[in-house]
């Protein structure tokens, strides 16, 4: 079984914990913007800071879509270039008419840019370029609390958290521009900027836990993930040529596996589900890419979510009796493939090893009671997408209504993730059982992403290592695009995979306010673009195939495939609405938002496990 290197923490779909070395892996630089070959850099202009990554070879690239983890935020929400940018690239981009948006400059190594008080040994460089502080734009001294930051902002954030400082209210409606020369003028806005760029509150508190205690918690979390990793084992693996075996990628043999299993739910079977790399096929035309991806998206993904939950007839019966809901069989499970006995035995051994964790978990207080369903639901939109079933089911029989007071104390067991069956554990459920429910509800969606990836033209030409890396890092972002229709921005409700809707206020009371607000905001922006089914399919492929993921064996091949998909997406968007020239740019601006959501989701799941201790 292929496992990821411990440094390959991309904030993936269910990357709940990083390596046991340090906690800030939860918001790693790779998952925020780029990997070791791609970085984020601010513009030298003093207006709105911009970010523009170098190419994997270290040379500058003029293409803002080449490494979409760092789409320049200097573009306005309407897609037009910011007026504060005073210069533009001298050569044109293949993704923009004429020249790329102005202000897309990279902070090159410049002795005049470095502040005199800082020695060159404290400057963080990447491919000969200077990394700038994400907060104020000064020269970054390293990766601090989840982002690249200077010494000043690192110390400011640490003091703010450790001393719990309440700063004086901003006099400019909390809209101060934080740059190096004025970063000390408004401390409230500076602290707000620290949080908005991804500095983690938990990175301070978690780091002060004694080493032995932290290792114990991480070991227990790892054990919980191992059981979930085997939920796919008893199901039929996707078709794999029986006479072929995984072969090394084109760049040489795969790196040795990490000593500990990868802490990912539903990903342990990726090497068995994916086919070995094949000989490169002729590059398809734009029309071929559009048609193949659109067909795969239409046939594999189900907007009615029929395959993600139970059927209406047995939904309430299962939960009333305390049984875990059964998922509807997928098309690849209907081929009559029997489960693998070896995988079943492995799952049984994991169950035996986790008896002690279950016993410890049984002493936790009862969880938040489930919420009653709202009587509103998404209706089919103008594109004809079926956003949800016409029936919304009430809370399971025999359990408390939604307006019941919170039971127990602050350690209630919560897993308020929209991609779960419920935002909480059912009555009497232990932490381990909640994890099992979560894995069972997530597994079908993950398998659909794997099947979709296999139908992307050129994806199976990549090495198997790179295929697995892309899937582990990007599956959550793909599912976020797919499940954007679960969020009803107008009614402020969200539908979980159990087909039950909850209001934003209810979920906020469960401790999920920040993540849900960010998901609502992303869903509103994405839905406002009114993507067609073909556009949504191609955008989903672009989200998955990202050359700036950490741990790639052959970044050049992934980048080439990414550019092919981007060209097809741009051609399709301009073909459908030729008058809306900024629509493609707006769509690309959603990519860094997905990276942020990916990290927030990983932190939420980690805090769930830590809070339950």
From Swiss-Prot:
Q: Where is the composition biased (Pro residues)?
A: 239-262
Where is the segment annotated Modulating?
Answer: 1-129
Enumerate the residue ranges of region (Required for phosphorylation by CSNK1E and cytoplasmic localization): 1-70
Q: Which residues carry this modification: Phosphoserine?
A: 55, 59
Q: Where is this region: Disordered?
A: 1-102, 233-286
Low complexity bias: where? 69-102
**Residues covered by region (Crucial for activation of GJA1):** 49-285
Residues modified as N6-acetyllysine are 192-193, 590
**What is any Pfam family matched here?**
zf-C4
Q: Where does the protein principally reside?
A: nucleus
Identify residues that carry Phosphothreonine. Answer: 275
- Residues annotated as binding heme are 417, 601
Q: How does it assemble?
A: Binds DNA as a monomer or a homodimer. Interacts with C1D, SP1 and ZNHIT1. Interacts with OPHN1 (via C-terminus). Interacts with PER2; the interaction associates PER2 to BMAL1 promoter region. Interacts with CRY1. Interacts with CCAR2. Interacts with NR2E3. Interacts with SIAH2. Interacts with FBXW7 and CDK1. Interacts with HUWE1. Interacts with NR0B2. Interacts with NFIL3. Interacts (via domain NR LBD) with HSP90AA1 and HSP90AB1.
Q: Domain comment, in the record's words?
A: Composed of three domains: a modulating N-terminal domain, a DNA-binding domain and a C-terminal ligand-binding domain.
Name of the protein: Nuclear receptor subfamily 1 group D member 1
Classification from the root reads: Eukaryota, Metazoa, Chordata, Craniata, Vertebrata
């Amino acid at each position: 079984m292929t496992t990821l290197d411990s440094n390959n923490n991309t904030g993936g779909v269910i990357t709940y914990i990083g390596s046991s070395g340090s906690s800030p892996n939860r918001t790693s630089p790779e998952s925020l913007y780029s990997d070791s070959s791609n970085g984020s850099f601010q513009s030298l202009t003093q207006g709105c800071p911009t970010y523009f990554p170098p190419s994997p070879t270290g040379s500058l690239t003029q293409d803002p879509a080449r490494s979409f983890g760092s789409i320049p935020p200097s573009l306005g929400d309407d897609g037009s270039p910011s007026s504060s940018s005073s210069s533009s690239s001298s050569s044109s981009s293949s993704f923009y008419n004429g020249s790329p948006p102005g202000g897309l400059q990279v902070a090159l190594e410049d002795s005049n840019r470095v502040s005199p008080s800082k020695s060159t040994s404290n400057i963080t460089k990447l491919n000969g370029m200077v990394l700038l502080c994400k907060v104020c734009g000064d020269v970054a001294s390293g990766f601090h609390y989840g982002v690249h930051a200077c010494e000043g902002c690192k110390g400011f954030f640490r003091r703010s958290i450790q001393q719990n400082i309440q700063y004086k209210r901003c006099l400019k409606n909390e809209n101060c521009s934080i740059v190096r020369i004025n970063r000390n003028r408004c401390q409230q806005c500076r602290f707000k900027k620290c949080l908005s760029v991804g500095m983690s509150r938990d990175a301070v508190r978690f780091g002060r836990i004694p080493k032995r205690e932290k290792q114990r918690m991480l070991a227990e979390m790892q054990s919980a993930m191992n059981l979930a990793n085997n939920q796919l084992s008893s199901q039929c693996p996707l078709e794999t040529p029986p006479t072929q075996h995984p072969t090394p990628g084109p760049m040489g043999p795969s790196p040795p596996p990490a000593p500990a299993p990868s802490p990912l739910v539903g990903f342990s079977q990726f090497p068995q589900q994916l086919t070995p790399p094949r000989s490169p096929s002729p590059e398809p035309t734009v029309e071929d890419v559009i048609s193949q991806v659109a067909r795969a998206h239409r046939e594999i993904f189900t907007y009615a979510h029929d395959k993600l939950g139970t059927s209406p007839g047995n939904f309430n019966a299962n939960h009333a009796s305390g049984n875990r809901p059964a998922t509807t069989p997928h098309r690849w499970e209907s081929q009559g493939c029997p489960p693998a006995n070896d995988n079943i035995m492995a799952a049984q051994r994991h169950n035996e090893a986790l008896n002690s964790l279950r016993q410890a978990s049984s002493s936790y207080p009862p969880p938040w009671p489930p919420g009653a369903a709202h009587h509103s639901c998404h209706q089919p939109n103008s594109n004809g997408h079926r956003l949800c079933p016409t029936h919304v089911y009430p809370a399971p029989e025999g359990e408390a209504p939604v307006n019941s007071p919170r039971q127990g104390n602050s350690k209630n067991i919560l897993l308020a993730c929209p991609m779960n069956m419920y935002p909480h554990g059912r009555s009497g459920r232990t932490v381990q059982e909640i994890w099992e429910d979560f894995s069972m509800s997530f597994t079908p969606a993950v398998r659909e992403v794997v099947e979709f990836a296999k139908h992307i033209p050129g994806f199976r030409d990549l090495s198997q290592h790179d295929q697995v890396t892309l899937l582990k890092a990007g599956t959550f972002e793909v599912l976020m695009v797919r499940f954007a229709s679960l969020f009803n921005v107008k009614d402020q409700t969200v539908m979980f995979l159990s087909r039950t809707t909850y209001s934003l206020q209810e979920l906020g009371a469960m401790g999920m306010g920040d993540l849900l607000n960010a998901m609502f905001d992303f869903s509103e922006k994405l839905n406002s673009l009114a993507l067609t089914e073909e556009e949504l399919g191609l955008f989903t492929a672009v989200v998955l195939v990202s050359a700036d993921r950490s741990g790639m064996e052959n970044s050049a091949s992934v980048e080439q495939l990414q550019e092919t998909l981007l060209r097809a997406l741009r051609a399709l968007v301009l073909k459908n609405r030729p008058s809306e020239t900024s629509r493609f740019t707006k769509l690309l601006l959603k990519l860094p938002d997905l990276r942020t959501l990916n990290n927030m989701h990983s932190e939420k799941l980690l805090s769930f496990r830590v809070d339950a201790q």
